[in-house]
């Protein structure tokens, strides 16, 4: 019976496919038992220590087997003269032969057992059970479990990858979030830059009830126009002033009174009436709606200039009727404006200088007529006497009938004035 051949055949069959652990353990136990029982030692005496470790029945059988083998060797030497060497010699001690196949199977068996005990996870293989007789066998034993470990690692890695979410998805989600954050931050930066780039003024005027930027160019230009027109109006009418009412509207106060003139024996009173912005908008003489304080001031200036022209025309007509009377309108207007600016807003008649001069001239004329003898009596003495003289004779007791006075004070709002504001008193 060739044990080595059987061992080789069995080991070749075990390489590709692994048998169950129970069967391999049984086979290994039988093989070890056969080796111990069938292979006697060369020196039975030297193997006595080994026999002590065996059961008593096996030790007796081994002793009887050595006796029979020695008799057979003597017969063989007598026939052939040469003693064949034993198959396996223990070398005086009970030692196992160096069978490479058996060692490989034992190492494989130990590796499989440890892998199953560790749950197919550990990557280290125990090499203490492998004897240190052959280095090549150790290399083979080390390489084989390394392959199994790598395969098991691959399997475990695949399972872990199936369980753990893919990091690429997380990276993509993170990149998307970062991109969205960057987009939001960029939009915020753009908004802030646009706000910084905005000019510090507003070109369009705010509506009524809304605040306007006092530092805007449009507001500055508007105020400059208003101030320029106000200065021009103050030059035309020295007593005018600008103010605001409770509603915030700008009102113009023109401080000159009513002028009383007598033309062809009739009193002529010129009034300057108070007009507000609403009256200006609803005026019939200006169909288009006029908006803006500067435009209103322009209309006021035009109306004041027209009134001044009318006064000049009336004074010229009065001078043509009676050239001896010097009205001196400039001094009259200056005195009236000064008195009104001082606060005399009581509509009381103001006595002027020219009626006194007129009365003095009339008295001197009558005195000269009385001193000179009448050379010729005119039939129409009334024609030589001026008209205002006759009226004075008729109303001799009333001293204040021929005086120019101011009837009321005038408050003009920021509006144009109606052109037909000349009232004739009969």
Swiss-Prot record:
Species assigned in the record: Arabidopsis thaliana
Molecular function terms from GO: DNA binding; DNA-binding transcription factor activity; protein dimerization activity
UniProt xrefs under CDD domains: bHLH_AtBPE_like
Polar residues bias spans: 117-137, 148-172
RNA-binding found in the keyword field: no
Cellular component GO terms held in the UniProt record: nucleus
Gene: BHLH60
Principal subcellular localization: nucleus
Alphabetical list of InterPro entries matching this protein: bHLH_dom (IPR011598), bHLH_ZIP_TF (IPR024097), HLH_DNA-bd_sf (IPR036638)
Gene3D superfamilies linked to this entry: Helix-loop-helix DNA-binding domain
Residue span(s) of domain bHLH: 210-307
Disulfide bonds: none
Expressed in which tissues: Expressed constitutively in roots, leaves, stems, and flowers.
Protein name (Swiss-Prot/TrEMBL): Transcription factor bHLH60
Pfam family, one: HLH
Stretches with biased composition (Basic and acidic residues): 191-200
Region Disordered: start-end pairs: 117-201, 367-398
